[in-house]
Amino acid sequence: MGARASILSGGKLDDWEKIRLRPGGKKQYRIKHLVWASRELDRFALNPGLLESAKGCQQILVQLQPALQTGTEEIKSLYNTVATLYCVHQRIEIKDTKEALDKIEEIQNKNKQQTQKAETDKKDNSQVSQNYPIVQNLQGQPVHQALSPRTLNAWVKVIEEKAFSPEVIPMFSALSEGATPQDLNTMLNTIGGHQAAMQMLKDTINEEAAEWDRVHPVHAGPVAPGQVREPRGSDIAGTTSNLQEQIGWMTGNPPIPVGEIYKRWIILGLNKIVRMYSPVSILDIRQGPKEPFRDYVDRFFKALRAEQATQDVKNWMTDTLLVQNANPDCKTILKALGSGATLEEMMTACQGVGGPGHKARVLAEAMSQVTNTNIMMQRGNFRDHKRIVKCFNCGKQGHIAKNCRAPRKKGCWKCGKEGHQMKDCTERQANFLGKIWPSSKGRPGNFLQSRPEPTAPPAESLGFGEEIPSPKQEPKDKELYPLTSLRSLFGSDPLSQ
């Protein structure tokens, strides 16, 4: 029994004795269950030593699983015990036997799916791929497989919906993967409208074909038997070559990828057409005052795809123009991020710019800055413009008379005379004419001191045959003064005295 009980030890044995036989039950697994499982394996002619490892338990489960449907209760109990022991070996946390069976079923399903996937991949690799127009038949010979109507329908639908927007080019490249020049011409012929664009495309193809003929001149002499002639520009375009010749060039040794060459010419022409159908330059893409940054980025990169430039130039446009053409709010945020910021960081930082929340936050910050500036200016003015006090006793600055240490001055602090105080001093009460105010006699200065005389001329001066003297005949020393004297305003008038 000692050898049979030594299947588990240490921490695994502790985990084994914590597992319950049934969900919610009180009984737990003990060493006696391991001894019983070993004896049962002996009875079924299986090696009890397999219980000492997870791999051995897995082999036992594979042998016992087919007999579960028709087996006795002892076989089911043995299967449950081995399944629980497998989870203990694998350090899988379980609480009871039911959880152990669920874990075993999950592992078996996963292994089954992996096995099926491996078999499927192996089967696919053993067969010739049917995804390309040129496939191999059972004899190993290359055979052309025409484009499906579904592929052509997808291409026509893209042209109808997108016209010649930048995303048409990658769509054409995906649908024409591995196609022959004949297949490419079929795709171009399915385009009913946009004949101006098609004519531009033909011109580009003719130019590239002429350049091909110039760079690849025909070798003099006849073609050797068993060899394929070299393709000309018109052959690559499918004008002067048939399908068999195209397949021969594409599958020859060495191969001449006429389909890929012709496809490259078409994409070059499509780039020119996309440029014509997208007249907006990348320099004209600017973010509106209230436009979200995400919409601005979408328009920017859509215009960037239509630009006829190298990838280095496009990268420079992205790093420079994307920030330069943003609105002031986003531009301030993007410049604060620095030149090394990624597009994700830019979009995250500018998220919500232009909305009501952002406007309220900007307004609050501006108001806070103005308030702080005013407070600092007020504090600065208070510090810079201190009130200068002067002592009336000694005449020095920096203290007042109450705190003055000099001997107390007698008399008036204003004029220095004795007999009166500063508040009664008349030195400071003289008006600008030099007269003391208020006067000790007469009415207050803001009242008229005499009755105003009429200023209109007498009735005799209005006519009745009397001659009005001219101003030139009046004496020069006679000057006109207002009838109301200054006495009415400032007390006594020195001119009237």
UniProtKB/Swiss-Prot annotation:
InterPro entries: Gag_p24_C (IPR045345), Gag_p6 (IPR014817), Lentvrl_matrix_N (IPR000071), Matrix_HIV/RSV_N (IPR012344), Primate_lentivir_Gag_pol-like (IPR050195), Retrov_capsid_C (IPR008916), Retrov_capsid_N (IPR008919), Retrovr_matrix (IPR010999)
SMART domains to which the protein is assigned, alphabetical: ZnF_C2HC
Disulfide bonds: none
Positions of the UniProt region annotated as Interaction with Gp41: 7-31
Region (PPIA/CYPA-binding loop): 217-225
Site (Cleavage): 132-133, 363-364, 376-377, 431-432, 447-448
GO molecular function: RNA binding; structural molecule activity; zinc ion binding
Mod. after translation: Gag-Pol polyprotein: Specific enzymatic cleavages by the viral protease yield mature proteins. Capsid protein p24 is phosphorylated possibly by host MAPK1; this phosphorylation is necessary for Pin1-mediated virion uncoating.
Organism: Human immunodeficiency virus type 1 group M subtype J (isolate SE9173) (HIV-1)
Protein name: Gag polyprotein
Modified residues (Phosphoserine): 148
Segments for region (Interaction with membrane phosphatidylinositol 4,5-bisphosphate and RNA): 14-33
GO cellular component, one term: host multivesicular body
Record PROSITE patterns: ZF_CCHC (PS50158)
Coiled coil segments of this chain: none
Modified residues (Asymmetric dimethylarginine): 408
Gene: gag
Lineage top rank: taxon: Viruses
Short motif LYPX(n)L motif, span: 480-489
Chain intervals for the UniProt region annotation (Interaction with host CALM1): 8-43
GO BP annotation list: viral budding via host ESCRT complex; viral translational frameshifting
Annotated spans, Interaction with membrane phosphatidylinositol 4,5-bisphosphate: 73-77
Keyword terms: AIDS, Capsid protein, Host cell membrane, Host cytoplasm, Host endosome, Host membrane, Host nucleus, Host-virus interaction, Lipoprotein, Membrane, Metal-binding, Methylation, Myristate, Phosphoprotein, Repeat, RNA-binding, Viral budding, Viral budding via the host ESCRT complexes, Viral nucleoprotein, Viral release from host cell, Virion, Zinc, Zinc-finger
Chain positions covered by the region annotation Interaction with host AP3D1: 12-19
Region (Disordered) location: 436-497
